[in-house]
From Swiss-Prot:
Native species: Mycobacterium marinum (strain ATCC BAA-535 / M)
NCBIfam families, alphabetized: rnpA
Organismal lineage: Bacteria, Bacillati, Actinomycetota, Actinomycetes, Mycobacteriales
EC number: 3.1.26.5
Quaternary assembly: Consists of a catalytic RNA component (M1 or rnpB) and a protein subunit.
Record-given protein name: Ribonuclease P protein component
Biological function: RNaseP catalyzes the removal of the 5'-leader sequence from pre-tRNA to produce the mature 5'-terminus. It can also cleave other RNA substrates such as 4.5S RNA. The protein component plays an auxiliary but essential role in vivo by binding to the 5'-leader sequence and broadening the substrate specificity of the ribozyme.
Family: Belongs to the RnpA family.
Enzyme kind, highest EC tier: hydrolase
Gene3D superfamilies, sorted: 3.30.230.10
């Protein structure tokens, strides 16, 4: 699971990442990546999840969120401390395995950083 310091909680962070960040679309997730212009010395990368009701029932949405948090955690060490990532789950994400979600998330992050021209 993600620690509290690695979770996005404020809507302003979500909005800035989604609106100003680089977006990559995968079959089951959309990944938004943004490097914050200002970050404190003790800052760490933050990840936020968007799981819409279209994904399924509350139980299915929670299951997808748990899977995404689980696969996002090991990727934190590859991110810059100022990086902000929002993962939007698409309805088809409830039918796929965690391994497939991890592969899509890795691919989405790689493509987003290539598009942004940022080093990791």
């Amino acid at each position: 699971m993600l620690s509290a310091r690695n979770r996005m909680r404020r809507s302003t962070e979500f909005d800035a990442t989604v609106r100003q960040g680089v977006r990559t679309v995968q079959p089951d997730v959309i990944v938004h990546v943004r490097r914050a212009k200002e970050c404190a010395a003790d800052s760490s990368p933050r990840v936020g999840l968007i799981i819409a009701k279209s994904v399924g029932t509350a139980v299915e949405r929670h299951r997808v969120a748990r899977r995404l948090r689980h696969v996002a955690r090991p990727m934190l060490m590859n991110l810059h401390p100022c990086d902000r990532v929002v993962i939007r789950a698409l309805p088809s994400s409830r039918h796929v395995s965690s391994a497939w979600l991890e592969q899509q998330l890795r691919s989405g992050l790689r493509r987003a950083f290539e598009s942004a021209g940022a080093d990791r």
